[in-house]
Every structure is written in C-alpha cells, then in structure tokens.
Amino acid sequence: MAAKEVKFGDSARQQMLKGVNVLADAVKVTLGPKGRNVIIEKSYGAPLVTKDGVTVAKEIELENKFENMGAQMVKEVASQANDVAGDGTTTATVLAQAIVAEGLKAVAAGRNPMDLKRGIDQAAAAVVKEIAAQSTPCTDTRAIEQVGTISANSDSSVGRIIAEAMERVGKEGVITVEEGSGFEDELAVVEGMQFDRGYLSPYFINNQETMSAELENPFILLVDKKISNIRDLLPVLEGVAKASRPLLIIAEDVEGEALATLVVNTMRGIVKVAAAKAPGFGDRRKAMLEDIAVLSGATVISEEVGLSLETATLDQLGTAKRVTLTKESTTIVDGAGNAANITSRVEQIRAEIANSSSDYDKEKLQERVAKLAGGVAVIKIGAATELAMKEKKARVDDALHATRAAVEEGVVAGGGVALVRALTKIVDLKGENEDQSVGITLALRAMEAPMRQIVINAGAEASVVVDKVKQGEGNFGYNAATGEYGDMLEMGILDPAKVTRSALQAAASVAGLMITTEAMIADLPKDDAGMPDMGGMGGMGGMGGMM
C-alpha cells in the first residue's frame, strides 16, 4: 500500500478552502444575465465555450491533492443541484463557497464546528420554508417562457420555443433537445404514440411521396412472439378481409413465409397490411406492448396468459384512427382505448417511476407516460457554427429543466431576491447556544452571495444594490440586465422555487461536511526521478573510405 500524507486541523482546512475558491471563482463568473463565458480546452477539436456552471465545474481537476479534495466537494454541490432540479448549479456553488469561507473563519476563531453545522442546517431549513411560502404557481405560458428565458441566459427565443413545446405536449409530455441542421431553432411535435421501429418490408409503402405506409382506421394485432407460419395468421386475416379494413401487426418479428404472404396480399390489394417489430427488448418490450394495447383497446396475444394466434378473434384486436409507418418509426394516432384504462396505466407507470432508483429507468418510464398521456416534442437547435450549437444546446437543456421545475413547485423572484427576502424574514432566528447562533448568522449572511455575484458580473456596486433590495419588500429587486430596480415578477425575472431550494440544500449539506473536517489524507506525490543520463555516445569516426 502506498504511503499517505495526512494533514490536520487548520492546515488541512486552508488547503481545502484554496481548492473550493479555485473552482467556485471559475464557475461564478457565469452567473446572471451578464455572466461571462468560460473557454475549456478539449483534447481534440475546437475549445468549448460555455456559460453552464456544472460544465465548468466538471472540467476542474487540481494538481495539489488536498486542494483538489476541496474542489471535488464543491463539484459535488453543483452535481447534486443539477440532479435534483437540472439547473441552479452556479447558485449552489456560490452559496457553498460563501458558507465554507465564513464557516472556516468561525472555526479558526475557536467556534465548535459541530454547533456551527447545526446552526447552518437550521438556517437552511428556515430559508427553504420561506422560499416555499414565497412561491407562486407557474401555470400560464408567459411565466413558463420567462423562466426559460432567464435560465437560458436571457435568450428569449429559447424561452419562447420551450413554452410552445410545453403548451403542445402538456405537462406529462416529453421534450427532447437535438442538434439541428439549419440556423434557426425548430420545434417538431409528434401526435399520438410513436416508437422507434419502422415497417418490416418496403413493399408495405403506399405513399411514395413520404415513403411511408399509411393505414386509415386499421385493426391492430399485438403478438409477443415471432410469427413465421402464415397458418397461424389466417383466422385473423380472414376476419379483417371481411371487415374491409387495414391491419397493423406488431410482433417480436414477422419473417419468412408469413412476411412474404402479407406482402403478396398487400400488393394484390386483397388485405391492406403493414407489420412492424415491437419496440424495446425483454421485459421493456412486454411493457410497451401492453401500453400499445391499453392505448388501442387491444389484447396482447401471449402464450404466457394462455392466448394463441390461431384462436385470436377480431375482439382481441385494437383500433386507431390512423397509423403511419416509416423506415425508422411507427406512429399510432387516436387509439380507441378506454380513457379510464389509459389513466390507470399512467398512474401505474408513475408509481414505478417513484420507486425506481435508476435514472435511465426513470427516463424510459417517463417516455412511456408521455406517449400515453401527453406527446413528444423535439426542439432542434440551430446555430451558425458547431461551437455555437453545442453552447446553445447546453443552455436549452438547462432552460428545459428549469421550466419543468417551475411547473412542479412554482416560481419565486429571480436575481437572488428570494434568498435575500427570506433572510430578512428570519433575522431573529436563534440557536440553542452561541455557536449555533453564529452558524445561523453566517449562513444567513451567505444568502446574499448569489445577488452580490450577479451584480458584480453586471459591473455594478454589490453592497449598494443589496442594501437597497433589503429595504424593499415583496418581489422588489435589481434587474442586472437593465440596471433598474422594480418588481422582479413583473419584469419577468423568475427562478423556479425548486431550483433555488435544491441549490441551497446542496450547498448547506456539503459546506457543513467541509466545516467539520479535521483531517485529510492523500497519497504522497510520486518521486518521478527519471533514468540516469546515459551520457553521449562516442563519435564513429575513422570509418571513412569504406566504399
């Protein structure tokens, strides 16, 4: 085992604070409407230009191991805030730096670190309550647009397109962000349920312009196994032919003789059929087939529940108003499923989301909810260069998370006003002893840090602005973009309550750990003494004349 270096007490904490300051100073320049850019070198390609706090934080790795530990702990603050609310990473970093700096001064002055931590936790809990009390519901499109605009560094076009996407697909809908191919941002909304499996044979195409197979008012047959024998399908095909309606088959696969017969029947016009593979794999495939069944009013033909294809009847088929199959996807519009069954299925999936610990599973389950209850919107980002596109995509992702958080827990006045207003309400808060009260005081003093940083980045005098805002009431604050004072909500400067809350909780939690640190352990730096110098090799003279 390699030898370790151990540092104790104040010497350890000061090294840790240096690391905290390096990371936080790099991140906090991005805060506010007049936040600056940070340029990050990449091992290949052009450098990355960003105003996203968590992107900056993730890139920082320091040479000194003790300083690096401090930086990594603040990085954890940014990641935690990002995981909970998807935004507020810079605010969380600024708060953590302020609490740690004040806290370590108090520890150096002889205060009890554990009591300081209790005081900080008490202050954070009181401020969180105040934020909840200040919060107003975010229901109308204009408020959603304003939240998106603020979170995208005051880019109103981003706010507008996110608000439109939310309006089109509803709160349950899934909105994804992709890199587009033009200069302008585009919004594409998918009606109905879409999954990423297309037609199994190009011979099913009946619309040559769009190269798609379109079925009007079709029956839908769902099977959770491969279909290779056409005899299994004959009873269903005969029933569908008599009803003179098209048929969509979704199965694990349709191959060989079965697929060939379906193609021939379609080309001759006997029965209009299209077939697609079921989406997903394994258990997820079964779940998604069940979703399609609920949406279309079908029964999944599965041997697990004692149903076989040979005995299937038209009653077990679903229906929809329209189905479109392209090479890559299948879209079912207006399935004839029972509304109560769809609602209960959505509730069931939501319960699974609540119980799931995997982010990937949660994302996939949320997509299923969207396909059943809402819709799917895709925002395609446009920009002049790839660099600008990457930077804009990061901002749109942030703005999207912020608007979701706003819809969830409402909005508060932005620009750091909510925290300043909360601390003026609980200025009389006291701890059980003097050290706890000091912890409360230093945490409340740190609540001003985000507003101070926004004002500094805008080139104004922080102390003057903070004092003036403290004297005001309600949503009165400072608009750093214009340099004016006024009602923040009326000026459209809003922050999601969830973002402000999670930033504060993450900062207080990690700052408390750092203040109560008494020893730090790291590997000793390796002594990289090179190989001894081999000296020059003698000349190879005297070899002339060798022809």
UniProtKB/Swiss-Prot annotation:
ATP binds at residues 30-33, 51, 87-91, 415, 479-481, 495. It is found in: Cytoplasm. It catalyses: ATP + H2O + a folded polypeptide = ADP + phosphate + an unfolded polypeptide. One of its GO terms (biological process) is protein refolding. InterPro entries: Chaperonin_Cpn60_CS (IPR018370), Cpn60/GroEL (IPR001844), Cpn60/GroEL/TCP-1 (IPR002423), GroEL-like_apical_dom_sf (IPR027409), GROEL-like_equatorial_sf (IPR027413), TCP-1-like_intermed_sf (IPR027410). Its EC number is 5.6.1.7. One of its GO terms (molecular function) is unfolded protein binding. Its main location: cytoplasm. GO terms for cellular component: cytoplasm. Keywords: ATP-binding, Chaperone, Cytoplasm, Isomerase, Nucleotide-binding. It is an enzyme of class 5 (isomerase). It comes from the Bacteria. Together with its co-chaperonin GroES, plays an essential role in assisting protein folding. The GroEL-GroES system forms a nano-cage that allows encapsulation of the non-native substrate proteins and provides a physical environment optimized to promote and accelerate protein folding. Belongs to the chaperonin (HSP60) family. NCBIfam families: GroEL, PRK00013.1, PRK12849.1, PRK12850.1, PRK12851.1. Forms a cylinder of 14 subunits composed of two heptameric rings stacked back-to-back. Interacts with the co-chaperonin GroES. This is Chaperonin GroEL.
